[in-house]
Amino acid sequence: MANESNNLGLEITELRLGLPGDIVVSGESISGKKRASPEVEIDLKCEPAKKSQVVGWPPVCSYRRKNSLERTKSSYVKVSVDGAAFLRKIDLEMYKCYQDLASALQILFGCYINFDDTLKESECVPIYEDKDGDWMLAGDVPWEMFLGSCKRLRIMKRSCNRG
C-alpha cells in the first residue's frame, strides 16, 4: 500500500513541516533540530528595509496649529508712528520696563519718547490698544499688565494731538 501511494504522485498534496517550495527527496530524513547546523553558514548581506514615510504625515493642519500656538507665546506687537509710512513689529518680552522700551523706540523711530506722564518735554506720546479695543496711554498701568493687554502700539506726535 505504501508503495502504491508513492507511485500515485501524491507528494504535491502531502502535508509536511517546512518552508513552501522545499523539495524533500524521499531518501532524505527530516531532522528534528530547530536551528541550522553550525556547518551551514548563512551569509545574508541584506540591508534592513528602510522605513518609508507615509505621504501626508505628520498632518499639516496639526503641525501648523502646533507651531502657531508656539508663536502666540511671544508678544510681538505692531508699532506705528504718526507721519511714518511704515510699521514695525517688536517683541515686548525683550524689554524689562517702560524705559527700556522707550530707548528702543527712540533708536528705531528717532523721536524722543518718555512714558512718564509728569514730564511734558517728550515730543511723542505713546498709546496702546488693549484687548478690549480701547486706546490707553502707555505708562499708566504696571509693566506686567501692559505686557498682558497690549495688542498694538501707536506713537502720536504732540503737535498733532493738541488740536
From Swiss-Prot:
GO BP annotation list: auxin-activated signaling pathway; response to auxin
InterPro entries hit by this protein: AUX/IAA_dom, AUX_IAA, PB1-like
Limits of the PB1 domain: 74-160
Record's note on what induces expression: By auxin.
Motif (EAR-like (transcriptional repression)): 15-19
Tissue expression per record: Highly expressed in stems and flowers.
Disulphide connectivity of cysteines: none
PROSITE patterns according to UniProt: PB1 (PS51745)
Cell compartment(s), UniProt: Nucleus
Keywords, comma-separated and alphabetical: Auxin signaling pathway, Nucleus, Repressor, Transcription, Transcription regulation
GO cellular component terms listed in the entry, alphabetical order: nucleus
GO-annotated molecular function: DNA-binding transcription factor activity
Highest taxon listed in the record's lineage: Eukaryota
Domain notes: The N-terminal half of the protein contains two conserved domains I and II. Domain I includes a slightly degenerated ERF-associated amphiphilic repression (EAR) motif which seems to be involved in the activity of transcriptional repression. Domain II is required for the correct degradation of the protein through the SCF-mediated ubiquitin-proteasome pathway. Interactions between Aux/IAA proteins and auxin response factors (ARFs) occur through their C-terminal dimerization domains III and IV.
Primary role: Aux/IAA proteins are short-lived transcriptional factors that function as repressors of early auxin response genes at low auxin concentrations. Repression is thought to result from the interaction with auxin response factors (ARFs), proteins that bind to the auxin-responsive promoter element (AuxRE). Formation of heterodimers with ARF proteins may alter their ability to modulate early auxin response genes expression.
Family designation: Belongs to the Aux/IAA family.
Subunit structure: Homodimers and heterodimers.
Name of the protein in question: Auxin-responsive protein IAA5
